[in-house]
Amino acid sequence: MKIMEIEKTNRMNALFEFYAALLTDKQMNYIELYYADDYSLAEIAEEFGVSRQAVYDNIKRTEKILEAYEMKLHMYSDYIVRSEIFDDILAKYPSDHYLRDKISILTSIDNRD
């Protein structure tokens, strides 16, 4: 897999984690099978009894939807910024248990389902 494809796959998987609840069941299934489970278009089409073109169109549409959600809500990009700030604080104050505890709480909030 090319680097650009890996980056896109990683981004789609991340956006899916944040916005899956906003998608239809079909959109969730197709995106998860395609990006997370590495199914081909043909495999997804066969599983759902539709054409490869139908799967392709749905995936492309859903990618645009996920990107639109991120453009409006910034959940993924904000998560990245928060994670970097937490890492910086922990690196600068490694022995501060109060900060460690608070960052641990904030991290657990970010990572809950």
Curated annotation (Swiss-Prot):
SUPFAM superfamilies noted in UniProt: Sigma3 and sigma4 domains of RNA polymerase sigma factors (SSF88659)
Membrane-crossing segments per the record: none
InterPro entries: RNA_pol_sigma_r3/r4-like (IPR013324), UPF0122 (IPR007394), UPF0122_fam_protein (IPR054831), WH-like_DNA-bd_sf (IPR036388)
Coiled coil: none
Domain of life: Bacteria
Protein name (database record): UPF0122 protein Sez_1013
Family membership noted in the UniProt record: Belongs to the UPF0122 family.
Source organism of the structure: Streptococcus equi subsp. zooepidemicus (strain MGCS10565)
Pfam families for the chain: UPF0122
Task performed by this protein: Might take part in the signal recognition particle (SRP) pathway. This is inferred from the conservation of its genetic proximity to ftsY/ffh. May be a regulatory protein.
